[in-house]
């Protein structure tokens, strides 16, 4: 059986190339890109990356635009919280 990676995980495919710090950055991106996310439409963990910035739920079939490597970008979270806060100010 082939030897498995212990520390490097998904970036073991790069071997010793590109340097350790760059491989750590890439590992963070690739782990988030391949993980499953929570679907806000059906309530299940079924959202996976289809292409760059396109995320689709395998359970309900909904497709959502998001970030390249994560489903929600930092700026999108900021905008969503600002809109929520402004709505609450208007209502009450």
Swiss-Prot record:
SUPFAM superfamilies: Zn-binding ribosomal proteins (SSF57829). Keywords: Metal-binding, Ribonucleoprotein, Ribosomal protein, Zinc, Zinc-finger. It holds the Pfam family Ribosomal_L37ae. It comes from the Eukaryota. The keyword Zinc-finger applies. A zinc finger (C4-type) spans 39-60. One of its GO terms (molecular function) is structural constituent of ribosome. One of its GO terms (cellular component) is cytosol. HAMAP family: Ribosomal_eL43 (MF_00327). This is Large ribosomal subunit protein eL43y. It comes from Arabidopsis thaliana (Mouse-ear cress). The gene is RPL37AC.
